[in-house]
Design a protein with these regions (language model features):
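Active-site pocket-lining/capping segments in soluble small-molecule metabolic enzymes
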Residues: 1-259
């Protein structure tokens, strides 16, 4: 599994990164990043919607990089320009439907960042043949009201290996430097997390000790189609977290002791 880290992280972590993402407002640092991290792909990301790029500079970056440069964009017009210039790119927003995925494939993206519900149909996503990236620490990214994020996108560190067949890059979104570094250690190095799952997954507001959750839960989530929100009867995610709820475990143990 490849890991993408933001350029603001310390040198200790950037040396381990497969990809380093830098905001366009800091694009003057791209040359330094090429030199300091010769094994990493440098991703230049739009800082603001509608931001104007200096395409002459970007052409230079791409030429010097020799296959280690890419753009992360939010605007289709800019994506079309990048395609015309032969510069690798992908759209930074999460893809939720197969219709979007097909359109982006036809556009010529180098990656797609996926979100629910297609996150729960990994075999179908794989069939499109487009490299996939996932922000593993965010249960949902829209501003719609949600109960708790239980039926959202979350990947346990222990189960990251199950996604290697489907996902090419893990990244971390919307967190401070110290938390992103901690998440890298947890997912890439320790590969386990004993505490509450909601402590490492943003927008997951439901208790459950991660060490008590069985890997079979993830095996079920890979291709379940998120039928739980389509009128289906599946409650696996809720049951898994309920069985890992420390208060419920304590109450169960106390009840057993009283027998």
């Amino acid at each position: 599994m490849k890991y993408c880290l933001h350029s603001r992280l310390s040198n200790e972590y950037l040396l381990k990164a497969n990809e380093i993402k830098v905001k366009y407002r800091d694009n003057k640092s791209v040359f330094d990043l090429f030199e300091k991290y010769p094994e990493a792909t440098i991703i230049l990301e739009e800082s603001l919607a509608g931001e104007e790029f200096n395409w002459n500079d970007i052409i230079k970056y791409n030429k010097i990089a020799q296959g280690r440069f890419m753009l992360c964009l939010g605007d289709i017009a800019m994506a079309t320009k990048a395609k015309e210039l032969g510069i690798p790119f992908y759209m930074g927003y999460p893809v939720k439907t197969f219709y979007e995925l097909e359109g982006l494939k036809n556009l010529g993206v180098s990656y797609v960042r996926i979100d629910v519900p297609i996150f729960f149909s990994m075999n179908k996503v794989k069939a499109f043949g487009v490299p996939v990236r996932v922000a593993v620490n965010v249960a949902y990214v829209d501003m719609l009201p949600r109960d708790n994020g239980v039926c959202g996108l979350w990947i346990r560190p222990e189960d990251a290996w199950m996604y290697e067949e489907y996902v090419d890059v893990f990244e971390f979104s919307g967190c401070e430097i110290s938390k992103e570094e901690a998440l890298y250690r947890i997912y890439a190095e320790q590969k386990e997390w004993p505490g509450e799952l909601q402590m490492i997954i943003s927008n997951l507001n439901y208790p459950g000790l991660n060490r008590m959750i069985l890997p079979e839960v993830t095996d079920s989530r890979l291709n379940c189609g998120q039928r739980c929100v389509q009128g289906g009867a599946c409650r696996i995610c809720y049951r898994a977290l309920d069985l890992a709820n420390r208060d419920k475990i304590r109450a169960y143990v106390e009840a057993i002791d009283q027998l």
